[in-house]
Structures are given as C-alpha cells and as structure tokens.
Amino acid sequence: MDKSSKFFFEDQKYNKERIVRVLGGNLALLKSKGILYEDSSGDLIFNYVGVISNGRNVIFILPKYCNRHLDEHSKRTLFNKLLKIFKKYSGLNKSRESDYFVSELDSDEVSDFMIADYLLNDFSLNGYYQKKFTEYEIDGEGIIDWSKTVNEITPVFSKGVPYYFSTYNEVVQKDEYHLIVKIHKWALSKYFNDFGVILGFTGLEFDKSCDGMKILDYADFFGSVINKEIVNTYVDRDVKLLKALKTAIDREENQFSKRPTLSLYGTKYFHRVWEEVCKTVFSHVNEYVKKISRPNWINFTDIEVNKEKKTLEPDIIKAFEYRSKEYFLILDAKYYNINFDGKKLEGNPGVEDITKQLLYDKALEKLSRGKTKHNAFLFPSSNSTNTFKVFGSVDFDFLDIAAVTLVYISAEQVYNLYLENKTFSTDDLFKFVSEINKSKKRHSVITSTLYGNMFLFTKRLSDKN
C-alpha cells in the first residue's frame, strides 16, 4: 500500500506522539466524536473498531479481544472479514449515530474505504466506464439506419419499387480515451494503492497510464464534466459509478486543503455487532421473549394494574432436542476482554449484567421446565481451533439460582457462519452443552479435592493439639 497504513487495537494504551504522527491534527475531532480518549497518564485509547483515514494515512483498529502478536497478513485477513461483517450488519440494521457505516457514494460522510470497495468491486464485475459513440458504415454488420439510408442513398427502382443494394449500418464504438474513462482509471489506481490489499483485490489488474493525472489542477472542470454526464445517463450502474468518481475528486481536493479531513468506516459500539452475530448463529427464538411476564404497575388509589409494555429481553434464547432429550439455552453475548490473571480479574462484566442474566433464568423458569437448562455468557476469543471453551462461572451465593457459565466462542468460526448465512447445527449445540457439562464436572472434582485436603489439614492440626 502506498499510503502509510498501521494497525492498532481497541482499548489499548498508545503513546500520544505515536498517534499524532499518524493522524496529525485530527485528534481533537476524534476525541469530540468519542472515538479516541486520553487517560490520566496522557496515553490515548481507541473506543472504536474500523478504519480511519485522514487523506494521507490510513489506520485500522482491530477489536480488543484480538491477539496482539498477529502478523501483518493475519491482521489484514481478519480485518477484511470484519469489513464484510460490517457491510452485512449495516445492511440489516438501521445505523445509529455511534456507527459510521454510510454507504451513499455521493454523501459527504461516506468513507474513502467504501468508495474504494465500490470502485474496485464494480471494476472486477463490469470493467471500465464505457463512453460510447455511434458511427455509420456502408454495408456494415450493425443495425440498418433506414432513415439515413433512404435520405442519402439512391435506390434502384423496379416496377416502381425502390431497392437499396447498399445501406448505412450503425456501429457503436467505445471511446477509450474519453476524459471520464481516464478519471475512472486514475481513481482505480489511487484507491487500489490505498486499500486494495486490505480489501482482498490483490489480483486485480488495470491500466495505470492515468496515475499521474493532474486532478487538483482541473478538479472543478472534471467535476462539471461528470455532473453533465450524470444528467444524461439513465443506467443505474453508470450513475452510481459517476457519483463515486465525483466524490473521489472532491476528496482529492479536500486532502490538500488546510482544513482537517477525516474519513471513518466502523463503529464505537462493536458489542452490538457481536450480539447480532451470536444471536444469528445460535438461531435466537424471539417468541420466547414475548412470553416473559411484564412488570405490573399498581395504582393504590383505584387499585388499577397497568402492564409495562417492555419486559426482560435476553440476547439469545434457544431450545433444541438431541437424542430425545430437550435443552434450553439462555445466552448473553458479552463483548468483554475478560481475563483471570491469577487472583486478579480484569475486563469482566458488571454486577448489573450478572443480576440481569440470573433474573432471565428465573423469568424463563416455566418455559424451560422439563428441559435441561444452561445459562451462559458468550465472550469472543481469537482462538480459531476451539469453537467453545468453558473457562469459569459467576453467581451470587445468596441466590438459589444456578451460576452463569463463562464461555469463550471462537470469533473466527462464528464470523464464518454469519457471512455464509449458516447457523450452529444441533450437533454443534449439543457440543456446546457437553463442554459446559464436562467443565462443571472438572470444577466439581477440583472443588471436592480442595475442600477434602483442607479438611484433612485442619484435622491433623487439631489432632496435634
């Protein structure tokens, strides 16, 4: 990539000078958007997953759960997959202010990244913009233009009937040197250099003869030519391509202006993406949510009971049957980088999250009756080998409710399912349940052994005394 491109990680501290070198005068703008914040020590932390481009440099921010020791190829591969997820997610969900998924190619807020993705993908499917003109050949192979033939060619008459032994035929030619075709070639080269590798278009080949085109010197003129072409074009693909080229010219102008430029494609709330992915691949059944009781609001004056419109809403509820046994899953997708470091716990959900999840268990008690129930938090993992890895549990010892199981889910595997429009099979779900059961048994054995050893140690001390 010709542009300077760097990978960073969400929620990791970075030296301020390092970020300034890459993003220059855009720090204040990023802070105002809540994408970047400064901690008490002066380090900068990204609260964002996605792409940031300032015209000269491009940075890619990976999710906080990712392995910090990934090589460059692995980072690019992962980010390419995340971009596909963003496109699918934004197409299915209404974008919020915290998301930067604008896809309208003539919008001031559309990302350079989206322009590149459109231009390169469109070229791979349709080739260059085609500016056509019509010429006429006598006795050619094209469609006969009878009006021109009758007006300009003398017929031979036989018994009063005219016979045309020659005709004018239309021949449609492509103007490969038209200005818009040249602008298209320039834009393809520019955006391929900036984003081609990360977007996975490494094998794309095109004419680079217009790389040195002086866009800045004639930006207004080029823009007016494209605008005129848009007015006279009625093919949807051509109109969309022309708008993308016009935006590319405008961005080139802005890049060299004195005001800061910033292009974003991503989200400040990746947890919504993680929730959507998990909800989809686990085949969440929303009908169960509708059956959960709603709060009762009682007016003591006239003893009137009002039902709240909203109720508890777990992320994922899934019931399934396997080998004549029924199972009931209550799951919550948690985008946390949780870590047990000896006795130290980091990146864990709050008390409110635990309380809600235990309350879901209670609220779904009747619906899950007769089924084997499991309640779990789902955390993303960079481990691509194990689909599910149970690593702990959380509960309140004063509540008579089963603990919430803590499970790492392979992010790569669920991303693949999501992009392929697939879900976990019944076998997969049973494997999920089996992993929880095996982990609980191991924990029970370890706990029993620990308490047994403590008892023996205490007894020996007592006997000595």
From Swiss-Prot:
Its EC number is 3.1.21.4. One of its GO terms (biological process) is DNA restriction-modification system. It comes from the Bacteria. Induction: Constitutively expressed during exponential growth. Encoded in an operon with ydiR and ydiS. One of its GO terms (molecular function) is type II site-specific deoxyribonuclease activity. The keyword Secreted does not apply. It catalyses: Endonucleolytic cleavage of DNA to give specific double-stranded fragments with terminal 5'-phosphates. BsuMI restriction activity requires YdiR, YdiS and YdjA. This is Type II restriction enzyme BsuMI component YdjA.
